[in-house]
């Protein structure tokens, strides 16, 4: 009898446990948002869409192209992905107008996603990039405001960009001569160039990455077949360059990880390369801040900006000016200034470098466009064109607006989609395209598919928000017959006098984000890209590379970066 009781007790316990497990399993299954399309069958799997997306990433190195493919399969401007057990679905929006409306006009319903903080927080905890759009965020943006003023960008940042671009031209002239028609990998040279110019612009520190690389470049090369990449031998990069690139790579590491909040802090604590890179970088910034402090705190007259040579200088000067005006001791919150300026590096070095890398690809793939671009540059920069060995100066590049150059850069942005997605978070229940999105949901606004590079999915105008309907005519719509072609002319409008004018509202494209959470450094990025494209096209014929070194395959991390950035260059002067 005792045995029977024990057996029945065990049976009851087992049944209860089984029922609990079944209930727990069902609770962990994805909970679709009513009415929003999704991939059938994924709602019945504990891990939802995650296995399919991870398989795609492992096969292609991309993430957002999977979302683009799913948008096409579902033929819907809005759909949902199930990526986390017991978590809310990700809502993906491919419609440009609705994404623009969410980011610009609906600030009381949407804010930046917590994902941004998880990625950048461990490495720049005091930067506004990870803050919600609140008073603290606004105070940090106010602190940085003058670093984006037209005068500062043109007079201080412009010459630094030009110097670094000229350094890249010098290095590539040497490599083009040694390669003698063979292609070579340009990716690391672009990274060195961007580190040089952003660190110098931000902190006033000359990393000299390109110079050190060129000086150590061996003149002895092993010649190979014309289509085989030339491999150069050079000394190791400087500690400054290595440290900064290593630290910046942490952002991409976090983005690629399923657990960004964990992986980067662990790397900074336990990986010697990351720990030493952070230590070196913080020490360098402290020294530059000290130099700027000494320069301006002891100055008799701080009413003029002639001594400003970097963003660090400018921030220290503004604090000294404010302190003297208010009759108090000046003070500098070094961790805040350090992290805000480091964010320029981490965001700018990766995204801008990727954008320039893509431009090299599209110039090589479209020789007629490259020829037209060079003709327009030489027609506009007459002094440099008529002076043997000369290139446009920094001020000439800043002051000269060439519609075709602007159109090429815009079309390169449209195809490169360096930032393939803008992520927002619902801070209250919100209606998007007729669907109620619950509070606390992440919204992924794609910039790489329908309405941008392919025809839009159909949308009933009546389900759009009122602000979206009101802005219907703000942007054009791309011609569906050629939306997939690389065509800079689509951005140009003929004026009554016959001249062509660049129209940035010609159609959907979103390279820097929009609204209050758009890229803060857009003015720096614009000038970097304009200067680099001008200098490269002016000085080199960018020839086609063999098929196995070409292609538009990409890798998604901190940016949408080309997997292969090989160039075949012929110096023109």
From Swiss-Prot:
Annotated membrane topology: Single-pass membrane protein
InterPro entries assigned to the protein according to its UniProt record, in alphabetical order: Cyt_P450, Cyt_P450_CS, Cyt_P450_E_grp-I, Cyt_P450_sf, Cytochrome_P450_monoxygenase
EC number(s) given by UniProt: 1.-.-.-
Compartments it resides in: Membrane
GO MF, one annotated term: monooxygenase activity
Record carries keyword Transmembrane: yes
Enzyme category, top tier: oxidoreductase
Keywords recorded for this protein, A-Z: Heme, Iron, Membrane, Metal-binding, Monooxygenase, Oxidoreductase, Transmembrane, Transmembrane helix
Protein name from the UniProt record: Cytochrome P450 monooxygenase GME11363
Organism: Pestalotiopsis microspora
Taxonomic lineage: Eukaryota, Fungi, Dikarya, Ascomycota, Pezizomycotina
């Amino acid at each position: 009898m005792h045995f029977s009781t024990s057996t029945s007790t065990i049976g009851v316990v087992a049944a209860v446990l089984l029922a609990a497990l079944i209930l727990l399993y069902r609770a962990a299954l994805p909970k679709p948002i009513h009415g929003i399309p999704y991939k059938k069958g994924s709602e019945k799997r504990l891990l939802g869409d995650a296995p399919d997306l991870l398989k795609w990433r492992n096969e292609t190195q991309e993430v957002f192209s999977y979302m683009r493919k799913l948008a096409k399969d579902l033929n819907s401007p809005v759909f949902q992905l199930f990526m986390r057990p017991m978590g809310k679905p990700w809502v993906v929006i491919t419609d440009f107008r609705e994404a623009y409306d969410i980011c610009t006009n609906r600030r009381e319903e949407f804010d930046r996603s917590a994902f941004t903080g998880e990625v950048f927080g461990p490495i720049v905890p005091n930067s506004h990039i990870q803050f919600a759009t609140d008073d603290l965020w606004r105070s940090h943006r106010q602190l940085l405001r003058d670093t984006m003023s037209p005068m500062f960008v043109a007079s201080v940042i412009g010459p630094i960009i030009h110097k670094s671009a000229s350094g890249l031209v010098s290095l590539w002239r040497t490599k083009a001569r040694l390669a003698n028609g063979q292609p070579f990998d340009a990716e690391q040279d672009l990274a060195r160039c961007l580190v040089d110019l952003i660190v110098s612009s931000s902190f006033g520190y000359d990393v000299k990455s390109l110079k050190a690389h060129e000086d150590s470049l061996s003149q002895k090369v092993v010649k190979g077949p014309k289509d085989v990449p030339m491999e150069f031998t050079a000394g190791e990069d400087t500690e400054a360059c290595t440290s900064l690139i290593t630290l910046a790579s942490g952002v991409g590491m976090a983005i690629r990880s399923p657990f960004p909040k964990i992986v980067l802090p662990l790397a900074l604590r336990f990986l010697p390369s990351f720990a030493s890179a952070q230590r070196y970088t913080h020490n360098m910034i402290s020294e530059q801040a000290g130099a700027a402090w000494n320069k301006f705190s002891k100055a008799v007259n701080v009413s003029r900006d002639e001594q400003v040579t970097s963003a660090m200088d400018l921030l220290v000067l503004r604090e000294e000016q404010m302190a003297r005006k208010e009759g108090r001791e000046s003070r500098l919150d070094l961790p805040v200034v350090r992290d805000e300026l480091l964010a320029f590096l981490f965001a700018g070095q990766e995204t801008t470098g990727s954008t320039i890398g893509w431009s090299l690809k599209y110039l090589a793939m479209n020789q007629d466009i490259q020829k037209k671009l060079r003709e327009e540059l030489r027609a506009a920069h007459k002094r440099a064109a008529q002076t043997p060995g000369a290139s446009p100066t920094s001020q000439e590049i800043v002051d000269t607006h060439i519609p075709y150059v602007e159109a090429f850069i815009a079309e390169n942005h449209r195809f490169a989609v360096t930032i393939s997605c803008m992520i927002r978070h619902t801070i209250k229940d919100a209606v998007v395209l007729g669907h109620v999105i619950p509070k606390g949901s992440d919204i992924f606004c794609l910039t790489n598919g329908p309405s941008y590079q392919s025809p839009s999915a159909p949308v009933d105008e009546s389900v759009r928000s009122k602000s979206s309907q009101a802005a219907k005519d703000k942007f054009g719509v791309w011609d569906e017959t050629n939306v997939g072609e690389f065509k800079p002319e689509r951005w140009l409008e003929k004026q009554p006098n016959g001249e062509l004018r660049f129209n940035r509202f010609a159609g959907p494209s979103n390279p820097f984000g929009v609204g209050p959470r758009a890229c803060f450094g857009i003015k720096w990025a614009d000038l970097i890209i304009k200067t680099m494209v001008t200098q490269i096209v002016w000085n080199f014929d960018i020839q086609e590379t063999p098929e196995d070194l070409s292609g538009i395959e990409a890798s998604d991390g901190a940016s949408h970066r080309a997997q292969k950035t090989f160039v075949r260059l012929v110096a023109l002067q």
